[in-house]
């Protein structure tokens, strides 16, 4: 197996750099299941229904030059932060700055990156919650003294328990929420720290320094959505996700073809 937790739970022949095409695997296979001369072929099968689970594509923030991702090493996207926080990640779960390996004493999360703007007017629905989770995780890993600030337009908690999670983050973990949208990030070239510029609720321009910034990137339709829609004869909505009805959220515009997960809408 290439991956221990692969799905489906099956073995494959990995013709990587260590395979010399000796063919010994054919002779030792007890069920004669290996045919090294097998060629790809097209098959037609009849099914009663089709379920589309294409998932989503994460927004690429490199095009937003004012936020510095790709230029400033300590500006990371949420997926990169998740890898740093993962016990199986490159830092074994220890959250460190990419520039110098130092544990940050202050982290800012910027919300709605690639969502609720002129290009992508829809809400990605998950960013508020995962940013709050990541901020709490920073407190747990780095200590309660680390400064965690979330720059957010408004709280979008799409669940009864989610509102309580926000309250817990604010009251118990002392996560700070700033209701604004960041206009620019600049780097201090000596320290690698980041200067975050934003407007206060009173309209005053303010600047605050953080040692690390996390961009809460939104969700976009998968790249294969249009190709699949054309081949299956289904419609997409104005944002490029699968078109459904509010009262039948699993049904596409073609009978017998259903959709699940984030392909129907960001979730």
Please describe what each predicted stretch is:
Residues 1-267:
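Residues forming the flavin
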